[in-house]
Amino acid sequence: MREILHIQGGQCGNQIGSKFWEVVCDEHGIDPTGRYVGTSDLQLERVNVYYNEASCGRFVPRAVLMDLEPGTMDSVRTGPYGQIFRPDNFVFGQSGAGNNWAKGHYTEGAELIDSVLDVVRKEAENCDCLQGFQVCHSLGGGTGSGMGTLLISKIREEYPDRMMLTFSVFPSPKVSDTVVEPYNATLSVHQLVENADECMVLDNEALYDICFRTLKLTTPSFGDLNHLISATMSGVTCCLRFPGQLNSDLRKLAVNLIPFPRLHFFMVGFAPLTSRGSQQYRALTVPELTQQMWDAKNMMCAADPRHGRYLTASAMFRGKMSTKEVDEQMINVQNKNSSYFVEWIPNNVKSSVCDIPPRGLSMASTFIGNSTSIQEMFRRVSEQFTAMFRRKAFLHWYTGEGMDEMEFTEAESNMNDLVSEYQQYQDATADEEGDYEDEDEALHDE
């Protein structure tokens, strides 16, 4: 079986992560004590991807939970599914990172990292054929960003040939938790560009907008936002957990979505999103799902795909539907909006179909797009970074933990390079005489 090892770090990561486990447990019919109470054999067929079966027939998530302070962990433990996790897999410090990337990456986090790696190793040895890791974290704080990226680079050293997928919550443009977010995020992106294979980019403001505009929630809580994220996370991995007509795994996903190794930051979307009140008045159809999932308002990060072009995209449909109809709709989208797709990668939209829909829906779809417009997000963070860094504001918090200004400069230029790479491919045309003539073949159609 192709197992995935789930790691969640920091306050944000632990909250998203525990919500994700609620959704996955529900889909596989596993109750909060780890017992199977489902009704369909399909739920158990590939349950090993995310669960370990213990001797007494209980299912234990392949999850590692880490934080530099005990608070969030305690609330996960007392939460609805808190008892399902292996108690040894909670790894936490006492000091906290205080929203300081350097503390998470170099001082406090570095002291705790070995105990986390021990747990990761133990879980990895429990797998038949480990497919890869998925990490939930935010980039604005200290633990998820600093210690999260430290862990990713350590895992990269130890398991170089396994996929590394991250669900990274970026700081949002208008909603800010802490003033040093741009520093933490830039230092993290610097790491993610080098060490992660696929990053699903999320941000609170876009999620907030979806809750407010589409779901008609007047005062969305973090719980509501995390519910959206967990629906997407469940959708990304449903092909691995259930049988389907067109299957896909983390590596296939990467092969189809990443034309150039550094450009692995994806926008994600989910459909159908309807307000709770109007759900029963709508029949879902494949065209409707397709239309909604390509809608810019549906993207879970604050970048507008209409401002850039799609290098590649992937659509995962769930439920009983005809693959023929799915393919027709996908071709239809590409033909109608051809200007939004780069013409030098033909057939750049991949679709997969999984037979089992999420709880309470007859069909659903998850969208993952590699769009050049994501540079808007990096640009925004980079501008805020430069504004503060020019004055060396708040820098003493980082240098005090032993960091060097040089590292900031490097991270800044790496992020700016990333932005200009996206821009370069946005402007590129198929017939242009350029250095990347032979790179058109980089995306194989399976």
Curated annotation (Swiss-Prot):
Positions with biased composition (Acidic residues): 429-446
Domain of life: Eukaryota
Comp. bias regions, Polar residues: 417-426
GO terms assigned for molecular function: GTP binding; GTPase activity; metal ion binding; structural constituent of cytoskeleton
Sequence segments annotated as region (Disordered): 417-446
Main subcellular location of this protein, as a coarse class: cytoplasm
Localization terms from the record: Cytoplasm, Cytoskeleton
GO CC, alphabetical: cytoplasm; microtubule
Cofactor requirement: Mg(2+)
GTP-binding listed as a keyword: yes
UniProt key word Acetylation: no
SUPFAM superfamilies with a match to the protein in the record: Tubulin C-terminal domain-like, Tubulin nucleotide-binding domain-like
Keywords: Cytoplasm, Cytoskeleton, GTP-binding, Magnesium, Metal-binding, Microtubule, Nucleotide-binding
Gene Ontology biological-process annotations: microtubule-based process
Binding site for GTP: Q11, E69, S138, G142, T143, G144, N204, N226
Residues at which Mg(2+) binds: E69
Subunit and partners: Dimer of alpha and beta chains. A typical microtubule is a hollow water-filled tube with an outer diameter of 25 nm and an inner diameter of 15 nM. Alpha-beta heterodimers associate head-to-tail to form protofilaments running lengthwise along the microtubule wall with the beta-tubulin subunit facing the microtubule plus end conferring a structural polarity. Microtubules usually have 13 protofilaments but different protofilament numbers can be found in some organisms and specialized cells.
Described purpose of this protein according to its UniProt entry: Tubulin is the major constituent of microtubules, a cylinder consisting of laterally associated linear protofilaments composed of alpha- and beta-tubulin heterodimers. Microtubules grow by the addition of GTP-tubulin dimers to the microtubule end, where a stabilizing cap forms. Below the cap, tubulin dimers are in GDP-bound state, owing to GTPase activity of alpha-tubulin.
Family as reported in the entry's similarity comment: Belongs to the tubulin family.
Designated name of the protein: Tubulin beta-4 chain
Gene name per UniProt: TUBB4
